[in-house]
Each structure stands twice: as structure tokens, then as C-alpha cells.
Amino acid sequence: WDASIAACQAGQADGMIAGASITDGRKESGWIFSDGYYDANQSMAVATGSDIKGFEDLNGKSVAVKTASMSATYAESLADQYGFTVTYFEDSPTMYQAVVGGQVAACFDDTPIMASNIKDTGIGMEIVDGTGNDPAAYGFAIFNADNQELIDMFNKGLANIKANGTYDEIIAKYLGE
């Protein structure tokens, strides 16, 4: 995640589409977004069979998040209220292994990404019901206004696949929705 942002800001990449949630804060800091292509929220997952059933069970424990992510912001917003600490990781697979291995009690991540990983890899985790926040749209992001043509082409292509039904087919195939 951080490497993608740095590459774009350094001009080594023209844009990124790695689950970049469209937020006012990101827009204010110079991100330029396409139209939203998927609404996603963040939620909490625990090791399969864990006694943790909600945020209130995290008191005195540590949770994992990806550095500089929406899930990190979400967990940080809950930490004081529920008495847990936040531990930062650079990628989801390492974070998930920390949950399964017991180094942390839970993790926060984008719900569709986490659900897909659990399903596809069989990793011993489960998403805790009732822990999701309000969804935000993912967008294709650029950091240089000279690349506006990329955003325009992306938006046109997105509109086309939504209009002809291809978008719905992709979502159904890969996300089961």
C-alpha cells in the first residue's frame, strides 16, 4: 500500500487502484479520484473459535491493521473507547497470520478483501458480525493532474461496463454478490 502511494507520488506509476477509498482527507492531500467503482466497509476478524464476539471483548488486547489504511483509521477511532492497542503491518497476509498465530487478538481490514482471503485461502479466521463501519467507495487514484486523461478513460470504461451488465457479472463472479 505505502509503496503504491510512494510510486505514484514519485512519478514512477501513473495511478493506483489498490482498494483506495475515496475520502475528503485524501482529496485534500492531493489525491485525484475516479468515480467510485465499489462500495466497501471495514470490519473486524478474529481467529476461528475465538471468544471475541465484539469490540467490548478487546479491552487490554492488541489488534492488527495495515499502515495508513481506512481500516487503521477505523480501529484507531475505537481504540480508546474499547481499551485496545493498535499494531501496524505492511500487508494483509502478514496481518492475518498474526491473528491466526495469536500475536494479536483481531484485525481490521476491508471487508470484501478479508472475506475473499478467508474464502480463497481457508485461513482460520472469521469476520465478527456487527463490526462493520459505514461503506466508502473505492476509486482509481492519481496524484498528478497531468494524468487526468487516465481518470476520464477509467470513468468512461466503468460507465460502459455498468451499462452493459459486465460490471454486475464481475461482481457476482468474484465477490458472490
State where each predicted segment sits.
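Short helix-initiation/N-cap motifs at beta->coil->alpha
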Residues: 1-6, 86-101
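Hydrophobic residues within well-ordered alpha-helices
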Residues: 8-9, 58, 99-100, 140, ...
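Ligand-binding clefts/hinges and TM-proximal coupling segments of bilobed small-molecule sensing domains
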Residues: 70-87, 125-129, 156-177
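A ligand-binding cleft/hinge motif common to bilobed small-molecule-binding domains
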Residues: 19-28, 74-77, 100-101, 105-134
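Structural recognition of the beta-strand scaffold that forms the well-ordered cores
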Residues: 14-19, 43-45, 63-66, 86-88, ...
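Acidic, polar ligand-binding/catalytic clefts
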Residues: 1-57, 126, 132
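Short loop->beta-strand "edge-of-pocket" segments that line small-molecule binding or catalytic clefts
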Residues: 55-70
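A bilobed periplasmic-binding-protein/Venus flytrap-type ligand-binding module shared by bacterial periplasmic
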Residues: 42-52, 136-155
